[in-house]
């Protein structure tokens, strides 16, 4: 698939120090794509006939932490894309403090211009690397949503056990990390789960039947939550949230075993402490190599 296809209208094509970015439209669907390693990767989608709804299955799965905490007070979103998730949370939780970190100014500008993203006193965007922000901010969150991505890969310093420890320290007691592990094209998910479980005692993964999207929710709490409690506790979610989604569908997507069995190794920082900022700059720039440390490949 290419944005130049006759069935698509290219609304914007731009290049930043971090990404090659397309905004395209076909009928009612408007999408943001990143290009990397010669391929295109979908980042965000809105249905213009229903712009307040979450059009991508991974965004709907990303709301799974609300099954544990139906009334968060402060959340952090690392990676903006088109802004669908923070915009949705801002709408259904008007009192929520929602901080978003996006390293690429061009992505933020395109989200404002084409995807109806607007900031407010309770929805703020910080132009910064996600890990640098977590280290600097020193704030406690109910939920951290980790969704950083660039064309063809994930910045490696945002996938390691050291970063997960930093996130764990930024969570309130009982706080949750939700991380996007992508779909079947990601062959590194077993190592992802092993890395998460080396920091968080409880990790629950969700995956849709077509394996388009995988989201893991990690908690520092030792006790797991039985599915029966999820099912019986759905009524605790605000009506503003319940009317947008089939929450029973989310519960049914809890993944047991299979590809998400923990791997035998974990992701660790590949730099010394004094090299942190150099590693961040290297990992965030557009991929100069066809073999980045954490690649995402399209499935054949």
Question: What label would you give each PLM region?
Answer:
Residues 8, 14, 25, 50-173, ...:
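The AdoMet/dcAdoMet-binding core of the Class I SAM-like
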Residues 149, 182-184, 208, 221:
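Histidine- and/or cysteine-centered catalytic micro-motif in compact active-site loops
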Residues 174-181:
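Conserved beta-strand signature within the Rossmann-like core of class I S-adenosyl-L-methionine
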Residues 37, 41-50:
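Acidic/histidine-rich helix-loop elements
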Residues 38-40, 149-152, 177:
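A short, flexible beta-alpha/helix-coil linker loop
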Residues 2-31, 35-37, 202-300:
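Soluble small-group transferase modules, centered on the S-adenosyl donor enzyme superfamily
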Residues 182-197:
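Conserved class I S-adenosyl-L-methionine
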């Amino acid at each position: 698939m290419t944005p130049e296809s006759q069935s698509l209208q290219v609304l914007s094509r731009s290049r930043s120090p971090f990404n090659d970015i397309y905004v395209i439209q076909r009928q009612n669907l408007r999408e943001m794509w990143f290009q990397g390693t010669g391929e295109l990767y979908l980042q965000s989608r809105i249905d213009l006939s229903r712009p307040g709804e979450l059009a991508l299955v991974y965004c709907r799965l990303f709301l799974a932490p609300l099954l544990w905490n139906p009334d968060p007070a402060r959340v952090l979103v690392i990676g903006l894309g088109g802004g669908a998730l923070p915009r949705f949370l801002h709408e259904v939780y008007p009192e929520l403090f929602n901080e978003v970190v996006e390293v690429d100014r061009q992505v933020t500008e395109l989200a404002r211009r084409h995807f109806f993203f607007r900031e407010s006193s309770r929805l703020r965007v910080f132009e910064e690397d996600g890990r640098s922000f977590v280290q600097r901010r020193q704030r406690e969150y109910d939920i951290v949503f980790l969704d950083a991505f660039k064309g063809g890969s994930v910045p490696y310093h945002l996938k390691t056990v050291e970063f997960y420890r930093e996130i764990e320290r930024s969570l309130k007691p009982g706080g949750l990390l939700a991380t996007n592990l992508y779909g079947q094209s990601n062959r590194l998910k077993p190592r992802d789960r092993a890395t998460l479980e080396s920091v968080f005692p409880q990790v629950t993964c969700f995956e849709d039947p077509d394996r388009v999207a995988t989201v893991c929710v990690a908690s520092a709490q030792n006790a797991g939550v039985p599915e029966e409690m999820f099912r019986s506790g759905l009524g605790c979610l605000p009506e503003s949230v319940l009317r947008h989604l089939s929450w029973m569908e989310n519960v049914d997507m809890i993944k047991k075993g299979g590809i998400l069995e923990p791997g035998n190794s974990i992701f660790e920082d590949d730099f010394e402490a004094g090299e942190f900022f150099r590693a961040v700059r290297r990992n965030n720039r557009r991929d100069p190599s066809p073999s980045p440390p954490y690649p995402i490949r399209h499935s054949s």
